[in-house]
Amino acid sequence: MLGTEELIQIRHHLHQIPELALQETETHAYLMEVIGKMEQDHLEILEPEDLPTAILVRVNGTAPVRTIGYRTDIDALPVQEETGLPYASTHSGVMHACGHDVHMTVALGVLDYFASHQPKDNLLFFFQPAEESEAGGQRAYELGLFEGKWRPDEFYGLHDNPALKTGVIGCRLGTLFAGTTEVDIDVLGKDGHAAFPQEANDAVVAAAALIMQVQTIISRSINPVEAGVITLGKLEAGTIRNVIAGHARIEGTIRGLTQEMIETIDRRLQDVCEGIAKSFGVTVNLALNQGGYLPVENDPALTKRFINFMQNNPAVDYVETAPAMTGEDFGYLLSKFPGTMFWLGVEDDAQLHQATLTPNEGAIQKGIDALTSFITYRSQAEED
């Protein structure tokens, strides 16, 4: 079995070879190398042709009544690493700045344990590409990867959290992560000389009014005790100071803790865009793309069981956490299969997606121990 030091070395290697969504070829090869060294007696491995960097590993149980799924993500971010670590990224401009190297290492540790300790139930480990973008979970589902013996009856997954103490398990009933929608807005007016505004139609003025109007959606259309966010983080317009811009481009994101809230915000944004178009005589083209980034809604019964187990396990430090407005594409899979997502504390001053993120590696073994004990307990249960 993999020891703690071996697991840390695995994490270091994974950290050095980060790859972007759907490009995780080196990561895939290394994962297959590690998995190939495990005991194979009751393992089956699927490398799907239509999603070639994905890996599914089935652990056949001794007397299964269900298949317990566990998912980990394997892609990285377009971030230039600034940690100064001796095992820093060797791929320029790409970094495991969201801790997916930790996620993979924990998953490998849990898989290795059950490769050596055959469980009662079947287990399904899904090493998923393209979480940060390209909606890898949705792709996998729509490609039919979870059909037949590869279908989980329930799905679990974790995300590292630098705001929690090392090794802490955090979870909650209900929504853990927000759903997200990408927003792209093009405002089309008419360019012209700055000295003759009456002969042009200023896209910058219309875009500015649109941005200000959007700020009223959350404050006046959403219940104040519920959480919703619209951030318009990018505005591009114009080429020179004395030319009225005929085109402005706005990009942003919508976040909501329920699908209903996201759809409400989407509708109100459409209303605002239509109003600005009429008010300023411009064309406003709005594109909304949610893809597979639905809210991560934990199944009530399974999550209650998970929380009770963690609370009553003396080896686990458990805390209840608030919903997070960050997105996670595991939400799509949880819309198809009941399951639970939870946090693993990795205690660091840096936040997720920052170039200096350095997760505390003491969380790896603690995460593995908590998961193996829970999956063993769950596998022995006869009830649904």
Curated annotation (Swiss-Prot):
Keyword Amino-acid biosynthesis in annotation: yes
Keywords per UniProt: Amino-acid biosynthesis, Diaminopimelate biosynthesis, Hydrolase, Lysine biosynthesis
Active-site residue numbers: 73, 132 (proton acceptor)
GO MF term list: N-acetyldiaminopimelate deacetylase activity
GO process annotations (BP): diaminopimelate biosynthetic process; lysine biosynthetic process via diaminopimelate
UniProt EC number: 3.5.1.47
Top-level lineage group: Bacteria
SUPFAM superfamilies noted in UniProt: Bacterial exopeptidase dimerisation domain (SSF55031), Zn-dependent exopeptidases (SSF53187)
Pfam families reported for this sequence: M20_dimer, Peptidase_M20
UniProt function note: Catalyzes the conversion of N-acetyl-diaminopimelate to diaminopimelate and acetate.
PANTHER family from the UniProt entry: N-ACETYLDIAMINOPIMELATE DEACETYLASE (PTHR11014:SF98), PEPTIDASE M20 FAMILY MEMBER (PTHR11014)
Family note: Belongs to the peptidase M20A family. N-acetyldiaminopimelate deacetylase subfamily.
Protein name (record): N-acetyldiaminopimelate deacetylase
Biological source species: Limosilactobacillus fermentum (strain NBRC 3956 / LMG 18251) (Lactobacillus fermentum)
Phylogenetic placement of the source organism: Bacteria, Bacillati, Bacillota, Bacilli, Lactobacillales
